A protein has these predicted regions:
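Sec-exported extracytoplasmic/periplasmic mature domains
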Residues: 36-43, 117-125, 141-149, 202
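Short pre-active-site segment immediately N-terminal to the catalytic Zn-binding motif
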Residues: 82-85, 89-111, 124-130
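Post-HExxH zinc-binding segment in Zn-dependent metallohydrolases
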Residues: 131-174
Protein backbone atom coordinates (compact mmCIF):
# COMPACT_ATOMS: atom_id res chain seq x y z
CA UNK A 1 0.00 0.00 0.00
CA UNK A 2 1.11 3.57 -0.56
CA UNK A 3 0.78 6.63 1.64
CA UNK A 4 -1.72 9.06 0.17
CA UNK A 5 0.32 12.22 0.58
CA UNK A 6 -0.01 13.66 -2.92
CA UNK A 7 -2.60 15.33 -5.11
CA UNK A 8 -3.23 16.01 -8.74
CA UNK A 9 -3.15 19.71 -9.50
CA UNK A 10 -3.85 21.77 -12.62
CA UNK A 11 -1.83 24.56 -14.20
CA UNK A 12 -2.42 26.57 -17.35
CA UNK A 13 0.77 27.96 -18.83
CA UNK A 14 -0.15 31.41 -20.18
CA UNK A 15 -0.27 31.52 -23.97
CA UNK A 16 -0.53 34.40 -26.42
CA UNK A 17 -0.98 32.29 -29.52
CA UNK A 18 -3.69 29.99 -28.13
CA UNK A 19 -5.38 32.48 -25.81
CA UNK A 20 -8.84 31.66 -27.20
CA UNK A 21 -8.34 27.97 -26.31
CA UNK A 22 -7.04 28.79 -22.85
CA UNK A 23 -10.11 30.98 -22.24
CA UNK A 24 -12.45 28.36 -23.69
CA UNK A 25 -11.02 25.58 -21.50
CA UNK A 26 -11.38 27.74 -18.40
CA UNK A 27 -14.99 28.48 -19.36
CA UNK A 28 -15.80 24.80 -19.93
CA UNK A 29 -14.17 23.80 -16.61
CA UNK A 30 -13.47 20.29 -17.93
CA UNK A 31 -9.98 20.03 -16.42
CA UNK A 32 -11.10 21.75 -13.23
CA UNK A 33 -13.74 19.01 -12.85
CA UNK A 34 -11.24 16.18 -13.34
CA UNK A 35 -8.96 17.20 -10.47
CA UNK A 36 -11.42 16.48 -7.62
CA UNK A 37 -12.57 13.29 -9.38
CA UNK A 38 -8.97 12.05 -9.57
CA UNK A 39 -8.09 13.04 -6.02
CA UNK A 40 -11.29 11.45 -4.67
CA UNK A 41 -10.57 8.24 -6.59
CA UNK A 42 -6.81 7.63 -6.37
CA UNK A 43 -4.11 7.68 -3.71
CA UNK A 44 -0.89 9.41 -4.74
CA UNK A 45 2.53 9.13 -3.10
CA UNK A 46 3.46 12.63 -4.34
CA UNK A 47 1.91 15.53 -6.25
CA UNK A 48 1.30 15.07 -9.97
CA UNK A 49 0.81 18.04 -12.30
CA UNK A 50 -1.66 18.21 -15.16
CA UNK A 51 -0.42 21.09 -17.27
CA UNK A 52 -1.91 22.77 -20.33
CA UNK A 53 1.00 24.22 -22.29
CA UNK A 54 2.42 25.12 -25.69
CA UNK A 55 4.55 22.26 -27.03
CA UNK A 56 5.31 23.23 -30.63
CA UNK A 57 3.44 20.15 -31.89
CA UNK A 58 -0.15 18.87 -31.54
CA UNK A 59 0.35 16.17 -28.93
CA UNK A 60 0.06 15.20 -25.27
CA UNK A 61 2.67 13.65 -22.98
CA UNK A 62 3.43 12.05 -19.66
CA UNK A 63 6.88 12.89 -18.29
CA UNK A 64 7.89 10.23 -15.78
CA UNK A 65 10.92 12.13 -14.48
CA UNK A 66 8.78 15.17 -13.66
CA UNK A 67 5.58 13.23 -12.76
CA UNK A 68 3.63 15.50 -15.07
CA UNK A 69 0.94 15.13 -17.73
CA UNK A 70 1.02 17.80 -20.45
CA UNK A 71 -1.88 18.47 -22.80
CA UNK A 72 -0.68 20.75 -25.60
CA UNK A 73 -2.65 23.76 -26.77
CA UNK A 74 -1.60 22.74 -30.27
CA UNK A 75 -3.37 19.40 -29.80
CA UNK A 76 -6.58 21.15 -28.79
CA UNK A 77 -6.33 23.60 -31.68
CA UNK A 78 -5.64 20.80 -34.18
CA UNK A 79 -8.54 18.70 -32.84
CA UNK A 80 -10.80 21.74 -33.21
CA UNK A 81 -9.63 22.17 -36.81
CA UNK A 82 -10.08 18.48 -37.69
CA UNK A 83 -13.59 18.25 -36.25
CA UNK A 84 -14.68 21.52 -37.86
CA UNK A 85 -13.87 19.89 -41.20
CA UNK A 86 -15.40 16.58 -40.11
CA UNK A 87 -18.71 18.15 -39.05
CA UNK A 88 -18.77 20.18 -42.29
CA UNK A 89 -18.32 17.03 -44.36
CA UNK A 90 -20.95 15.02 -42.48
CA UNK A 91 -23.57 17.63 -41.54
CA UNK A 92 -22.98 20.52 -43.94
CA UNK A 93 -24.37 23.68 -42.36
CA UNK A 94 -26.56 21.95 -39.79
CA UNK A 95 -24.10 21.70 -36.88
CA UNK A 96 -23.58 24.16 -34.06
CA UNK A 97 -20.60 25.43 -32.08
CA UNK A 98 -21.99 23.37 -29.18
CA UNK A 99 -21.65 20.22 -31.30
CA UNK A 100 -18.04 21.11 -32.04
CA UNK A 101 -17.17 21.99 -28.44
CA UNK A 102 -18.75 18.76 -27.16
CA UNK A 103 -16.76 16.67 -29.61
CA UNK A 104 -13.44 18.41 -28.93
CA UNK A 105 -13.95 17.91 -25.19
CA UNK A 106 -14.76 14.26 -25.91
CA UNK A 107 -11.37 13.79 -27.55
CA UNK A 108 -9.58 15.71 -24.79
CA UNK A 109 -11.26 13.36 -22.29
CA UNK A 110 -9.80 10.18 -23.75
CA UNK A 111 -6.44 11.85 -24.38
CA UNK A 112 -6.11 12.99 -20.76
CA UNK A 113 -6.89 9.51 -19.44
CA UNK A 114 -4.60 7.86 -21.98
CA UNK A 115 -1.75 9.95 -20.58
CA UNK A 116 -2.91 9.25 -17.02
CA UNK A 117 -2.75 5.56 -17.92
CA UNK A 118 0.98 6.02 -18.54
CA UNK A 119 1.19 8.01 -15.30
CA UNK A 120 -0.43 5.31 -13.16
CA UNK A 121 1.68 2.56 -14.74
CA UNK A 122 4.74 4.58 -13.71
CA UNK A 123 3.60 5.88 -10.30
CA UNK A 124 2.09 2.60 -9.09
CA UNK A 125 4.74 0.45 -10.85
CA UNK A 126 1.94 -1.56 -12.46
CA UNK A 127 2.84 -4.65 -14.47
CA UNK A 128 1.77 -4.54 -18.11
CA UNK A 129 1.91 -7.14 -20.81
CA UNK A 130 1.72 -5.87 -24.36
CA UNK A 131 2.42 -2.43 -25.77
CA UNK A 132 2.05 0.20 -23.08
CA UNK A 133 0.37 2.52 -25.62
CA UNK A 134 -2.41 -0.04 -26.11
CA UNK A 135 -2.73 -0.43 -22.35
CA UNK A 136 -3.05 3.35 -22.01
CA UNK A 137 -5.83 3.35 -24.63
CA UNK A 138 -7.55 0.63 -22.60
CA UNK A 139 -7.22 2.69 -19.43
CA UNK A 140 -8.83 5.62 -21.25
CA UNK A 141 -11.71 3.35 -22.23
CA UNK A 142 -12.03 2.01 -18.69
CA UNK A 143 -12.31 5.46 -17.13
CA UNK A 144 -14.57 6.96 -19.81
CA UNK A 145 -17.03 4.08 -19.77
CA UNK A 146 -16.94 2.96 -16.13
CA UNK A 147 -16.65 6.46 -14.56
CA UNK A 148 -18.22 8.72 -17.18
CA UNK A 149 -17.84 12.47 -16.87
CA UNK A 150 -21.04 14.00 -15.50
CA UNK A 151 -22.42 10.56 -14.52
CA UNK A 152 -23.79 10.20 -18.03
CA UNK A 153 -23.19 6.90 -19.83
CA UNK A 154 -23.71 8.61 -23.16
CA UNK A 155 -20.85 11.06 -22.65
CA UNK A 156 -18.35 8.24 -22.23
CA UNK A 157 -19.57 6.37 -25.29
CA UNK A 158 -19.60 9.58 -27.35
CA UNK A 159 -16.08 10.37 -26.17
CA UNK A 160 -14.85 6.94 -27.22
CA UNK A 161 -16.32 7.23 -30.71
CA UNK A 162 -15.17 10.83 -31.19
CA UNK A 163 -11.64 9.73 -30.27
CA UNK A 164 -11.88 6.76 -32.61
CA UNK A 165 -12.77 9.13 -35.46
CA UNK A 166 -9.90 11.39 -34.40
CA UNK A 167 -7.54 8.44 -34.94
CA UNK A 168 -9.15 7.73 -38.32
CA UNK A 169 -8.65 11.34 -39.41
CA UNK A 170 -5.04 11.18 -38.21
CA UNK A 171 -4.59 8.13 -40.44
CA UNK A 172 -6.09 9.99 -43.41
CA UNK A 173 -3.72 12.93 -42.91
CA UNK A 174 -0.92 10.57 -44.01
CA UNK A 175 -2.57 8.24 -46.52
CA UNK A 176 0.68 7.25 -48.22
CA UNK A 177 2.22 3.84 -47.97
CA UNK A 178 3.30 2.82 -44.51
CA UNK A 179 6.96 3.15 -43.62
CA UNK A 180 8.98 0.81 -41.40
CA UNK A 181 8.79 3.56 -38.78
CA UNK A 182 4.98 3.33 -38.78
CA UNK A 183 5.05 -0.40 -38.17
CA UNK A 184 7.83 -0.10 -35.60
CA UNK A 185 6.12 2.68 -33.63
CA UNK A 186 5.25 2.17 -29.98
CA UNK A 187 1.63 3.04 -30.85
CA UNK A 188 -0.63 0.75 -32.80
CA UNK A 189 -1.55 2.14 -36.22
CA UNK A 190 -4.22 4.83 -36.07
CA UNK A 191 -6.58 2.55 -37.98
CA UNK A 192 -6.10 -0.15 -35.36
CA UNK A 193 -6.71 2.33 -32.57
CA UNK A 194 -9.97 3.31 -34.29
CA UNK A 195 -11.18 -0.30 -34.35
CA UNK A 196 -10.04 -0.93 -30.77
CA UNK A 197 -12.01 2.02 -29.39
CA UNK A 198 -15.04 1.14 -31.49
CA UNK A 199 -14.82 -2.47 -30.28
CA UNK A 200 -14.58 -1.61 -26.60
CA UNK A 201 -17.49 0.84 -26.87
CA UNK A 202 -19.55 -1.85 -28.56
CA UNK A 203 -18.44 -4.34 -25.90
CA UNK A 204 -19.55 -1.96 -23.14
CA UNK A 205 -23.08 -1.74 -24.58
CA UNK A 206 -23.82 -3.76 -27.73
CA UNK A 207 -27.47 -2.69 -27.85
CA UNK A 208 -26.77 1.05 -27.90
CA UNK A 209 -23.85 0.67 -30.28
CA UNK A 210 -25.20 -1.84 -32.79
CA UNK A 211 -25.02 0.97 -35.37
CA UNK A 212 -21.22 0.52 -35.38
CA UNK A 213 -21.74 -2.92 -36.93
CA UNK A 214 -24.80 -2.03 -39.01
CA UNK A 215 -23.06 1.00 -40.55
CA UNK A 216 -19.93 -0.98 -41.37
CA UNK A 217 -17.69 0.85 -38.89
CA UNK A 218 -16.85 -2.32 -36.94
CA UNK A 219 -16.56 -5.66 -38.78
CA UNK A 220 -18.76 -8.35 -37.29
CA UNK A 221 -15.76 -10.68 -37.07
CA UNK A 222 -14.24 -8.33 -34.48
CA UNK A 223 -17.52 -7.28 -32.86
CA UNK A 224 -18.30 -10.87 -31.84
CA UNK A 225 -15.48 -10.83 -29.29
CA UNK A 226 -15.81 -7.25 -28.06
CA UNK A 227 -17.94 -7.90 -24.98
CA UNK A 228 -15.30 -10.35 -23.78
CA UNK A 229 -12.48 -7.92 -24.65
CA UNK A 230 -14.13 -5.13 -22.71
CA UNK A 231 -14.86 -7.35 -19.71
CA UNK A 232 -11.18 -8.33 -19.63
CA UNK A 233 -10.12 -4.67 -19.65
CA UNK A 234 -12.43 -3.84 -16.75
CA UNK A 235 -11.43 -6.82 -14.62
CA UNK A 236 -7.75 -6.17 -15.35
CA UNK A 237 -7.86 -2.52 -14.32
CA UNK A 238 -10.13 -3.22 -11.35
CA UNK A 239 -7.49 -5.65 -10.06
CA UNK A 240 -4.49 -3.45 -10.83
CA UNK A 241 -5.95 -0.33 -9.24
CA UNK A 242 -7.55 -1.94 -6.18
CA UNK A 243 -4.64 -1.21 -3.79
CA UNK A 244 -4.50 2.43 -4.88
CA UNK A 245 -8.15 3.49 -4.70
CA UNK A 246 -9.42 5.77 -1.97
CA UNK A 247 -11.53 3.98 0.61
CA UNK A 248 -15.21 4.76 0.17
Amino acid sequence: AIQDVGDFYLTYEPTEVFKEYEDWLKTEQYFEDQIPFLNDQFKLPYDVAIKIDECGVPNAYYYSDEKMVVICYEFISHTDYKFTNFLDSVYGDSWTIEDLNYTVLNVIDHTLYHELGHAFIDIYELPTTGLEEDVADQFGAYILLEFPYGDDDQWGQDAMIATAFDFWMAAEENPDLFTPEDFADTHSLNQQRFYNLACWTYGFNPNDNQYLVDDGLLPESRANGCEYEYTQIVSGWDSLLAPFLQEE
